[in-house]
């Protein structure tokens, strides 16, 4: 099997905000369903604070690789890594062992910033709002990533805002 693609999955506001006080600054049930569909069965890389923000236990059906310089988390379905590079290496091994073609990056802000140079694909939920927050996603450089798909999604009854699902693919060197 070839090397699995590195896929970032993120929801961000129009002003690039992705978090506030260790949580997402919106409720988007529709987007959570999309996140599950995109990541199910695939290794999920996230930082320790993000892991704690999703309940401190693995999301079902996805092997987790948690990046932490200090805390050790010992539980089934969770591997630990001291750096993003180590986490990506472990997640790639898991992907190859389990026969999946993607490794998913699920945040938070620092992990996204470090992972962007390695990413092949970005699955971005653009939240049609500007919100206050303390964590932002880096600018997506159109010279590096081409938007290959965008779908408007009206706000459902359990969503604070309408969104647009976009897929960006890394441009290949000419």
Please place each PLM-identified region on the residue numbering.
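Enzymes that bind and transform nitrogen-containing heteroaromatic metabolites
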Residues: 2-174
């Amino acid at each position: 099997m070839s090397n699995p693609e590195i896929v970032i999955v993120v929801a961000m506001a129009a002003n690039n905000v992705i978090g506030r006080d260790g949580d997402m600054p919106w409720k988007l049930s529709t987007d959570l369903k999309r996140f599950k569909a995109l990541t199910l069965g695939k290794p999920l890389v996230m930082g320790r604070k993000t892991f704690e923000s999703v309940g401190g236990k693995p999301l079902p059906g996805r092997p987790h690789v948690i990046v932490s310089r200090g805390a050790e988390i010992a539980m089934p379905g969770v591997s630990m890594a001291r750096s993003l590079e180590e986490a990506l290496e472990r997640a790639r091994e898991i992907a190859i062992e389990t026969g999946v073609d993607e490794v998913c990056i699920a945040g938070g802000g620092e992990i996204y910033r470090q992972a962007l140079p390695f990413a092949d694909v970005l699955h971005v939920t653009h939240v049609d709002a500007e919100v206050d927050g303390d964590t932002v996603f880096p600018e997506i450089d159109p010279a590096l990533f081409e938007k290959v798909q965008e779908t408007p999604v009206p706000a459902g009854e359990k969503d604070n805002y309408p969104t647009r699902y976009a897929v960006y693919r890394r441009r290949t060197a000419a």
